[in-house]
Amino acid sequence: MANHDQQTVSSAAATTSASPSPVVLPKTSENEQLLRIRHSMSHVMAMAVQQLFPNARVTIGPWTESGFYYDFDNPEPFTEADLKAIKKGMIKIINKKLPLERVEVSRSEAEEKIKAQNEPYKLEILEGLQEPITLYTLGEDWWDLCAGPHVENTGQLNAKAFELESVAGAYWRGDETKAQLQRIYGTAWETAEQLAEHKRRKEEALRRDHRRIGKDLDLFSIEDEAGAGLVFWHPRGARMRLLIEEFWRQAHFEGGYELLYTPHVADISLWKTSGHLDFYAESMFGPMEVDEREYQLKPMNCPFHVLTYASKLRSYRELPIRWAELGTVYRYERPGVMHGLMRVRGFTQDDAHVFCLPEQISDEILKILDLTERILSTFDFNTYEINLSTRPEKSIGDDAVWDLATKGLIEALERKGWAYKIDEGGGAFYGPKIDLKIEDAIGRMWQCSTIQLDFNLPERFKLDYIAADGSKQRPIMIHRAIFGSLERFFGIMTENYAGDYPLWLAPEQVRLLPVTDEVQPYAESLLDQLTQAGVRATIDRSGDRLGKLIRTGEQMKIPVLAVIGAKEAEQNAVSLRSRRDGDLGVVAVADLLRAAQNANSQRAAGLELN
């Protein structure tokens, strides 16, 4: 089954799992040194916390992609003042140049030390470790269960290149039934200049936060009364979603796909057959009984497409079959991991499934790559990071089919000319896959598209086709999502554009600004012309002065503001102000209509008046 996961995004206000965040693996000596710095800094922080708060119990403290954190069980909540005191304590430890030394001990020795320090969480961690047990000491008075790596001494840490950033809630072992902890996040770098750049990038990310932009531009909301993780699309956001969906459908029809619509629920027996109840039950909403049958909301669209394939006898002459669906799915997400549109409980996946012959794999994958590039580049995502994940040790399926499928993926990527990295053994147990990350305007990489071969569902559902020799054969099944989650993609796209959407996609393309009541009838007539031409336009009827009309339009990031005074009305024209190009001067209405229609048909970023 394809699991086109949404991306987890940490939030300082959220309650998160007490488990390590993804890390940047050391690929160069420079990166490895940075990880050593961050890992060591987490120990320094834990030591400082326990010096200031002797009753604080420690749990885990890994490095992360941009820094480090440590989870504590402390009787009182940490405050901003506490963070300042902890930072001062850390600086003192750094200045002492205390050594960090690796020590191997037996299980019994480790248990004795842990019990002496009254560290129950470390005792639980110890249960899962094999001998020899490794500790790292920090000076003579503090130590931690740890495998490393670390710097040699705290003098190698730069006291001017770290910051404690926030406090969040976290559950021990990620289990909401267990103790709630306090997680202190920090960031650490080699130089003060790197720290300053990190802060600048973080401020820029906050400026681009899709949650703030979504509220400011009135695009969407999540209403507590309805429940967490359920998105309400407001009229302006709904317009944009419709534009995205229409483009997606057009691209798929042109790519040889047919569209499906499938139910939102299914009898529980379907989820047993598909394996979801065995492998995915924790992410599914519970069953509901209707007419003495149990149903569950779908967490994925795949089994429905499989049933559609199985609804009639298939011939090899029909293959490949390409089906796509904008299907809304429902998954249970813990409260702590939900984050705006990035991770929600009800979302729409742009799922597609291709049923093909083994010899068609490479061609079909190449077509998917071409379609992926066409769609993503339309939203100005042009830089990708691609990983090919191969067969893991535990897997199902015939060796020859695995080899053929993997070679097909490689061949398609090479025919496309895209660079890629191989993740040996990183594929799902049911097939190899390609994952594609996109880079946004400030250099962040986002997991987006997935292409996954599946040898599992065709076997579970006994799918077949009549081959040329009259025998029944299993089809190759390719799962594919380009956006992944439409909601999540909308959030990524919004942050990429910082809310300054290209003209073709803007919810309100042109705002008419009549400066006097006398030109109001002309403005109404122009609004009708624009609307009839397919241009999304409005009139500001507030009666405010021109300066405020313009400021309001700019705050709402309207791409084109059309000022209408007596002169413009007499000339059947408008004075245009473009967010992209500045003052465009007086423009005839006919030219505005033509340029706006061209922008829509060509999916252009702005008006081209020449």
UniProtKB/Swiss-Prot annotation:
**According to the UniProt record, where is the region Catalytic?**
209-502
Where, by residue number, does Zn(2+) bind? 302, 353, 479
Give the residue ranges for region: Disordered. Answer: 1-29
Q: Which Gene3D superfamilies match?
A: 3.30.54.20, Anticodon-binding domain, Bira Bifunctional Protein, Domain 2, Threonyl-trna Synthetase, Chain A, domain 2
UniProt keyword annotations, A-Z? Aminoacyl-tRNA synthetase, ATP-binding, Cytoplasm, Ligase, Metal-binding, Nucleotide-binding, Protein biosynthesis, RNA-binding, tRNA-binding, Zinc
**Catalytic activity, EC:** 6.1.1.3
On whether Thylakoid is a keyword of this UniProt record, the answer is no
The cofactor binding remark recorded in the entry reads: Binds 1 zinc ion per subunit.
Where composition is biased (Low complexity), the residues are 8-24
Instruction: Report the subcellular localization.
Output: Cytoplasm
The subunit structure is:
Homodimer.
Family as reported in the entry's similarity comment: Belongs to the class-II aminoacyl-tRNA synthetase family.
Full protein name: Threonine--tRNA ligase
Originating species: Synechococcus sp. (strain WH7803)
Q: Could you read off the lineage of the organism from its UniProt record?
A: Bacteria, Bacillati, Cyanobacteriota, Cyanophyceae, Synechococcales
